[in-house]
Amino acid sequence: MSINIKSIEAANRESRLNSITGYTGTVKDLVKKAQCGTLKNRERCFSQASNCSSGCAQGYLSSIVDAAIVNHGAIGCSADVIGETTGLKWGQNIRDWEKTNVKLINTNMTENSTVFGGKNKLREGIREAYRRFNPKAIFITTSCASAIIGDDVKAIADELEEEIKIPVVPVLCEGFRSKIWASGFDSAFHALLTRIVKSPRKKCPELINMIQFSGSGRKYITEILSNLGLVPQFGIPYSTIEQISRMSEAAATISVCGTLGSYFGNGLEQKYGVPYVKTIQPHGIKGMDSWLRELGKAVGKEKEVEDYIVKAKKEIKPELEDIRKKLKGKKAIVGMGPSFSHNYIRVLKELGIEVVWGISWHFDQHYDHGSVPESSIALSNRDKDIPISVCDGQNFEVLNLLNKIKPDLYISRHPGTTVWPTKMGIPSVMVADEYTAFGYRGIINFGYRIIDALENNSLAEELSKRIKLPYNPWWFKQDAFKFLEDEVK
């Protein structure tokens, strides 16, 4: 399915990728149904909590160095700015940059502006963002309130762009448009593809776009690519508008996360002919093998890739074998976004750990290049099937499963789910950094981190003795998926 570059907005994942938030079964069943078009979403008649696509769009764009955000909504819609500023400063710290806050203005829509329109507040917010931050571009993130009342954000953006002479770009990411918060990433990338990225002035055969979040693995990636005669261009966070505008000049695009990079990578390929490397994520041994080999094919560096793989795997072999011995027989549950979840199930297997259940916060039945996610296909091709479920961060389902299965370990990418198994006495590891388990060195570091969590579990043990969980015994006797409704026919 091609991306509609001419549209002002990105189609949500439910309509574009047939994404779902409700499922229980096995990975083989999931992939088989996705491939033949019979996979249906199962709604919940009870939902405890979720997230908002606006936060993903706003958070991702707010880390562009010389851009500003105008969030057109009620003041509460900017509550994410606390976490966004924390994340921004973490990234600045690992780069030894001066610490700054995110450059964001909220239009503070009130009852009056919701009833009579918020256009004047939006104009005021754009002018104030320009005056206060002197940005090279301003992104307007929308909210449920501004969308419901029909404020013409594009018309106001065009009007103010003429006035202040920099790009003023609508990012249509209001929360009610999608139940899948990753749709917010697509909204952000759509704004960049349609308004910021420019046609290439020249092609750079050594330049590789690297789509990521925080970028803590920059030195390792630079080292890897230098062995292949390539140079990474990291994006989108901590890039400038000028750097992003020239991403069409690269020889290829790679991503640390399929869920994140699919829209932008496929969009660059569709619009500018920059090949997007479509493969499993570069976590663990097989992930990095596949990632590098597909990159090598895209840029004609197959021999250099094979030479590097042989050398890198030889260096870690003794340590990896030792780690596997220590982790043999351990059982884990994984709960992450879909691309990370299905990749980390494989990574844990490479470390000698048996994954007894996998949870993903949603599932894309195909990516923008038309294929079922490569990580899911790879997992389904294994001899042993794995029970999995799809839930958009519903902790009541996660805790029910943990209570029944009682794994040795829980691995997640979000603190909101990692804290609960810790309170149940289960050792937990939060994969906050996207470069955890990245490549050959990363899997070694990840293995040691898991060993440490298993051997030093006194915090979880003591918490479990003192904390009463917010669910009564009745719930833990129920099927974890009691509130999943039947498939829509």
Where are these regions (language model features)?
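An N-terminal assembly and electron-transfer interface module characteristic of large anaerobic redox
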Residues: M1-K489
